[in-house]
């Protein structure tokens, strides 16, 4: 068989031309390409692929990169090969859908798999996705925080447009950080996103100790978001305050007031801002002055934090989700569902908002993010009150319930919800993966269930510690993570004490 020949012409305005010559079998053509965009610092640099390029060399470079990545991020589950394979899928998607080196972008709700929600950025990234990168990819973690810091001017403008002070982050953020939500009730009332951004930054600083980021925008973000909250709360009789016209993670509650999740995340935001102001006053007086900070202002944040109400049943003392959920119409939740698909496909949104049901974890989500604020009795009561009325109509819900259950000695529930979350997209549990793309936040929360639930990883007074609760049938769980710039290894065995060591 004669070898086919071809000649390649230089690119022109009309394109790249290949001329085939000779006779014989098929010709193998290898075309290499590099991509640069106008957002790159030097978009024309590095376009030459070099004469030694080949498909084989590119493939080997790709394999080498993934081998290194799996060595760093791989999870070993001994006793459940299917779960380990599914978790590798989770890690693959979380890695592939994040532009780790580009702080001008974040991660959309559907990643790169779909244009649902216009590709915009939500609180999903800050609460459900970011912790994976904090512990597994330092560069990606920093880029995600840099994106929020870079969007601070847009957040300040958004607050101004909403007749507020400081910085208010949008519900649906575009590339430049501007609000894209067209629904007045959701976009205007789901203000918890601002506290979520501050919470994520505080979490990032705790895990990484990134002083440079703190002093180059991080502290300012905490300060400006605190200033927003000082202007957002309304005075109440007796010297108290109320958070009016708000909506928590449970989007079925309608417009309410004093959502517990929002209130206590705001309290955390205010405390972080006060700590940041105190640190600037000690270590960066120039920035302290530039931000026009004062001890009086920081004291005002702490005073507001003390006044923020915690809704409770006046007779039992049990925590309430907000000021109105208990007033809604009782209903038997399974009557609204058909399998695991969302009930809003069968019941109109107006109607479902009048039922005493919740769309997704709200109080339970709060208890996984700020667990130290609640007693074991309060957590048990919250599970009794809110788990039975949750419709799990958001893909954010299954994994959060699994995480809560794993952290609070509810093994049956932990394994049941973990199964749904782990295979949500692989098995199309909710029947919308093909139509709407991958659910990145569920993938991130599934990883958190494994790390912070089953492994029980958390930060104690002296650094990382483990309080595991392995699923039945698992013989061992092993993984690596980052803490303060160093790599650590965790090993949890069913028949031995957990082991944690620095590499």
Task: Please give the residue ranges for each predicted region.
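Active-site core of glycosidic bond-cleaving carbohydrate-active enzymes
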Residues: 119-150, 216, 278, 288-435
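C-terminal capping/lid segments that line or modulate ligand- or cofactor-binding pockets
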Residues: 128, 177-180, 235, 252-280, ...
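Gly/Pro-rich turn-and-neighbor structural signature
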Residues: 69-105, 109, 263, 283-325
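Contiguous, well-ordered alpha-helical segments that form the cores/surfaces of helical PPI scaffolds
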Residues: 88-95, 115-119, 123-134, 191-203, ...
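Acidic/polar, glycine-enriched structural segments that form the non-catalytic walls/loops
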Residues: 1-116, 348-349
């Amino acid at each position: 068989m004669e070898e086919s020949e071809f000649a390649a012409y230089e690119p022109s305005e009309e394109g790249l031309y290949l001329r085939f010559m000779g006779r014989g079998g098929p010709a193998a053509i290898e075309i290499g390409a590099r991509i640069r965009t106008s957002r790159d610092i030097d978009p024309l640099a590095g376009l030459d692929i070099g004469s030694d390029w080949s498909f084989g060399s590119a493939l080997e470079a790709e394999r080498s990169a993934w081998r290194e990545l799996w060595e760093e991020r791989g999870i070993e589950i001994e006793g459940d090969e299917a779960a380990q394979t599914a978790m590798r899928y989770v890690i693959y998607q979380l890695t592939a859908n994040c532009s780790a080196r580009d702080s001008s972008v974040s991660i959309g709700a559907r990643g790169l798999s779909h244009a649902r929600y216009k590709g915009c950025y939500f609180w999903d990234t800050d609460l459900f996705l970011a912790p994976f990168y904090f512990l597994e990819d330092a560069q990606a973690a920093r880029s995600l925080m840099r994106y929020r810091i870079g969007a601070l001017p847009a957040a300040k403008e958004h607050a101004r447009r909403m007749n507020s002070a400081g910085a208010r982050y949008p519900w649906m953020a575009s590339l430049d950080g501007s609000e894209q939500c067209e629904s007045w009730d959701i976009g205007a009332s789901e203000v918890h996103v601002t506290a979520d951004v501050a919470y994520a930054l505080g979490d990032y600083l705790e895990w990484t100790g990134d002083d440079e980021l703190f002093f180059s925008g991080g502290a300012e973000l905490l300060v400006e978001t605190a200033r927003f909250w000082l202007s957002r709360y309304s005075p109440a009789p007796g010297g108290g305050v109320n958070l009016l016209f708000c909506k928590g993670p449970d989007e079925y509650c309608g417009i309410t007031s004093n959502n517990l999740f929002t209130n206590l995340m705001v309290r955390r935001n205010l405390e972080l801002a006060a700590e940041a102001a105190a640190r600037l006053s000690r270590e960066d007086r120039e920035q302290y002055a530039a931000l026009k900070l004062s001890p009086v202002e920081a004291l005002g944040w702490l005073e507001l934090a003390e006044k923020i109400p915690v809704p409770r049943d006046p007779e039992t003392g049990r925590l309430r989700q907000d000021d109105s959920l208990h007033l809604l119409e009782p209903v038997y939740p399974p009557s609204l569902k058909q399998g695991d698909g969302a009930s809003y496909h069968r019941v109109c949104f107006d109607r479902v908002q009048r039922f005493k049901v919740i769309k997704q974890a709200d109080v339970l989500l709060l208890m996984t993010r700020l667990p130290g604020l609640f007693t074991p009795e309060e957590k048990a009561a919250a599970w009794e009150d809110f788990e039975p009325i949750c419709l799990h109509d958001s893909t954010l819900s299954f994994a959060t319930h699994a995480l809560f259950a794993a952290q609070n000695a509810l093994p049956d529930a932990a394994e049941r919800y973990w199964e749904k979350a782990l295979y949500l997209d692989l098995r199309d549990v909710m029947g919308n993966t093909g139509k709407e793309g991958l659910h990145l936040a569920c993938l991130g929360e599934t990883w958190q269930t494994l790390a912070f639930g089953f492994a029980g990883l958390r930060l104690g007074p002296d650094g990382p510690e483990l309080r595991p609760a392995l699923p039945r049938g698992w013989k061992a769980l092993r993984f690596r993570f980052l803490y303060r710039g160093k790599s650590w290894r965790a090993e949890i065995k069913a028949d031995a004490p957990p082991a944690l060591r620095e590499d």
